[in-house]
């Protein structure tokens, strides 16, 4: 194979490697953003009122927030 052919194949390989690396970085950033959104949502959901805490305390559980106006009780709040 001529030197020109080898150089062209090398350049094509480098372009492929660079673009696949960029795609992986974008995918990772998207996943990170989704995780951050879930984390913020779970923190928002964990805010509890005193009424909810008292209700769940009677059941010896933790108040994880309210859903449709009803207290949500569990041993551990997972979000």
From Swiss-Prot:
It comes from the Eukaryota. Pfam families: Conotoxin (PF02950). GO terms for molecular function: ion channel inhibitor activity; toxin activity. Keywords: Amidation, Cleavage on pair of basic residues, Disulfide bond, Knottin, Neurotoxin, Secreted, Signal, Toxin. The keyword Cytoplasm does not apply. It is found in: Secreted. Coiled coil: none annotated. The modification Leucine amide is found at residue 78. GO terms for cellular component: extracellular region. Disulfide bonds join 52-64, 56-73, 63-77. Its main location: secreted. Residues 21-44 form a propeptide. Residues 1-20 form the signal peptide. InterPro entries: Conotoxin (IPR004214). Expressed by the venom duct. The presence of a 'disulfide through disulfide knot' structurally defines this protein as a knottin. Belongs to the conotoxin O3 superfamily. This is Conotoxin ArMSGL-0122.
């Amino acid at each position: 194979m001529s030197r020109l052919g080898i150089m062209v194949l090398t350049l094509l390989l480098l372009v492929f490697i660079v673009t696949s690396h960029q795609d992986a970085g974008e995918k990772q950033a998207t996943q990170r953003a989704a995780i951050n959104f879930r984390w913020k949502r779970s923190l928002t959901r964990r805010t509890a009122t005193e009424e909810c805490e008292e209700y769940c305390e009677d059941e010896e559980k933790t108040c994880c927030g309210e859903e449709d106006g009803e207290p949500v009780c569990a041993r551990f709040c997972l979000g």
